[in-house]
């Protein structure tokens, strides 16, 4: 059996799909379906069972027998960068991850988990090194601290531990994320609602490392299949502008022109104007597949979003 926590979320459900595509269906999805809309991410997927995240971790702590486990993909977390309840975030992201990690280590189960580019904060160099890490919010700190915890364990671990620092992920199965969904998702919605697509003023100068979620799932499966341990950036290594995203959405729809709105005061000084993964360590580990450009990935995403039932 394979366990995917956060399996009803965006990245988790895409990992389940990638596993299905390779013939794996004995999958336990762990999530919190308090937001019931997330169920739609699982409708077309084949899984064996579902567990609530609280029931699951209680079983982990109690040492329950989950049978033979081939791997754990730990994607579940509070991913809101605007959540400031530190106790909740640290319990949910840090303590939960530690309990699950030790369960896997004791049983020599491969453990692959979601870290984040939020571990870096305001920097122009995104290298997997303590020198460049300085999270700006408690979410980023929870991910940073778990990475630090893993770094101390890695030299002595007898089974795989692999963390991925996700950059700006976009693509299918993110509709439940609301305001946290990607710019491509929101621009598509605006055009379909008959509105002009909107960007912040200066968006041609805001450049992020946008990575298609299908590529993220592929990275996860490749590292699992090859048994590689470590903490790796998961981005394309090529920053592109928000304007490029908008251009790709408009090109797909063949209508609409971008309207520019003032940059909000509340984001000034708290907004990463630039992110770009250093992929040196990812490539050195042996992952050599190309990543989709914004033009390629957004088109594929638009085709999925606007598919006819």
From Swiss-Prot:
Top enzyme category:
isomerase
User: What residue intervals traverse the membrane?
Assistant: none
Task: Please indicate which superkingdom the organism of origin belongs to.
Answer: Bacteria
* InterPro entries, alphabetized: Epimerase_deHydtase, Heptose_epim, NAD(P)-bd_dom_sf
Residue positions annotated to bind substrate are 168, 179, 186, 200-203, 208, 271
Binding partners and assembly:
Homopentamer.
Protein name listed in UniProt: ADP-L-glycero-D-manno-heptose-6-epimerase
Recall the taxonomic lineage recorded for the source organism: Bacteria, Pseudomonadati, Pseudomonadota, Gammaproteobacteria, Enterobacterales
